[in-house]
Amino acid sequence: MADAASQVLLGSGLTILSQPLMYVKVLIQVGYEPLPPTIGRNIFGRQVCQLPGLFSYAQHIASIDGRRGLFTGLTPRLCSGVLGTVVHGKVLQHYQESDKGEELGPGNVQKEVSSSFDHVIKETTREMIARSAATLITHPFHVITLRSMVQFIGRESKYCGLCDSIITIYREEGILGFFAGLVPRLLGDILSLWLCNSLAYLVNTYALDSGVSTMNEMKSYSQAVTGFFASMLTYPFVLVSNLMAVNNCGLAGGCPPYSPIYTSWIDCWCMLQKEGNMSRGNSLFFRKVPFGKTYCCDLKMLI
């Protein structure tokens, strides 16, 4: 119980601290660029046309809504984080209890020790089920979080309170509205998990010397590196999921010119791939100008 409480508190603290970063990231993913491109230098020192980074973007939001505005969508995100942690922990606890029951079963037969690869498959499968259950239950809060952020673009107030947002989504879209963008999110989580654990197993088994005294430390580093690599490869699923969660929901940020109306998440994927925007929002610094993007300054000139 104490471990669960500490995980919830730690997760909530990290959620609060990272909220401004996620807010900026979501607006960039949707394609909202309120600040015009500038001439800057990339990491190699070459002069390029690039978009303002995280701090300039956050400063722009704060200049309109104040610093408190950077924490828009925090309440549903906290609810999602707390509920997800509890569900994830309960599912894993169920598996642990079933393992203990098998060990203490009648006859107390000694089981064969499974190979390390079988162990990886078993643990990854359990983690996948736990994460998927948590994602499925918390996705409605995730949708509300994204929409409350995206309404900054059109200065709407459609998704302000948690209860009001739930009523609005149910009234306009029904139950399915709470699960907009769920499929690519689940696929991305599952692929990322299996890719991360499989790569970590291969590195730990064939690349690291088991005789090294710092073996456990090296394994933790390899897990972190493979996790980062897996998240980079599966980022398009995150982008598509977030875009589908806000697409055609009655907000300016989910409609043209910021976002086309997608018929499905596959349609969204194909269109982003065609435009070369599959990594949009992945980097918050040294941001290159995306293809075919309309800026706020351009829109003002057209009005």
From Swiss-Prot:
Solcar repeats lie at residues 2-98, 118-206. The modification N-acetylalanine is found at A2. Residues 2-15, 93-135, 200-231 are mitochondrial intermembrane. Its main location: mitochondrion. It holds the Pfam family Mito_carr. GO terms for cellular component: membrane; mitochondrial outer membrane; mitochondrion; nucleus. One of its GO terms (molecular function) is membrane insertase activity. It is found in: Mitochondrion outer membrane. InterPro entries: Mitochondrial_sb/sol_carrier, Mt_carrier_dom_sf. One of its GO terms (biological process) is hematopoietic stem cell migration. Interacts with p15BID. Belongs to the mitochondrial carrier (TC 2.A.29) family. Protein insertase that mediates insertion of transmembrane proteins into the mitochondrial outer membrane. Catalyzes insertion of proteins with alpha-helical transmembrane regions, such as signal-anchored, tail-anchored and multi-pass membrane proteins. Does not mediate insertion of beta-barrel transmembrane proteins. Also acts as a receptor for the truncated form of pro-apoptotic BH3-interacting domain death agonist (p15 BID) and has therefore a critical function in apoptosis. Regulates the quiescence/cycling of hematopoietic stem cells (HSCs). This is Mitochondrial carrier homolog 2.
